[in-house]
A protein has these predicted regions:
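Structural signature of FAD isoalloxazine-binding scaffolds in flavoprotein oxidoreductases
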Residues: 97
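Catalytic core of pol beta-like nucleotidyltransferases
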Residues: 2-81, 85-93, 101-186
């Protein structure tokens, strides 16, 4: 069950779990990386958010995506971002993910083959049937996902900076504006 504590301004699970901070007046997470559970994300960014039916479909794709990644990676972390992690007026197009992969995991060639289609691919050309696409996203475009080697500071800093940027309604970056994002680990 979800409980709202107005005196702290934070949303928390009544039966334990992590705490997702209250959103700012503009419907964004406050700056920083915030630990969250899948259950909390569903409650705050689907059930309590505008466009709940639309978001529910994206979240179902995220749940299946998470299961597929966890079938391959015994441990890891998602950094969850994008319009999905907000209460903006416009519905989110997808859910953005950086998937932090522990380089010490004993991944086989088959594991790598299974991972490739789970990430956003750009400049894709296929021989049969002959097709070309600027961008191919997993889960029918509902997930926009990128692999990150965990523990490589340059990669983690890049994605932290990218996920902290704020875009306006026109899709352009808002200079100087900073927001937060979520972290789900298993």
């Amino acid at each position: 069950m979800i409980g709202l504590s107005s005196w702290t301004g934070r949303v928390a699970l009544a039966q334990g779990g992590t705490v997702i901070p209250a959103l700012t007046e503009s419907g964004l997470l406050p700056p920083g990386r915030h630990a969250a559970s899948m259950r909390e994300i569903r409650e705050i960014f689907v059930e309590q958010a505008p466009h709940a039916d639309h978001r529910r479909r994206i979240f179902r794709a995220f749940e299946l995506y998470s299961d597929m990644i966890r079938d391959i990676l015994e441990r890891g972390t998602f950094w969850v971002d994008g319009g999905f992690c907000s209460h903006k007026a416009a519905p989110p197009e997808d859910l953005d993910l950086a998937v932090l992969i522990d380089s010490s995991l004993p991944l086989t060639d088959k594991d790598h083959e299974r991972l490739i289609p789970l990430f956003t691919l750009q400049g894709v050309q296929a021989g049969q049937p002959q097709v070309w696409a600027n961008r191919v996203q997993p889960m029918g475009g509902l997930i926009d996902s990128f692999p990150v080697v965990a523990g490589i500071p340059e990669q983690e800093e890049y994605w932290d900076a990218t996920w902290s940027k704020v875009k306006g309604p026109d899709g352009e970056l808002v200079p100087g504006a900073v927001k937060g994002y979520l972290e789900v680990s298993w």
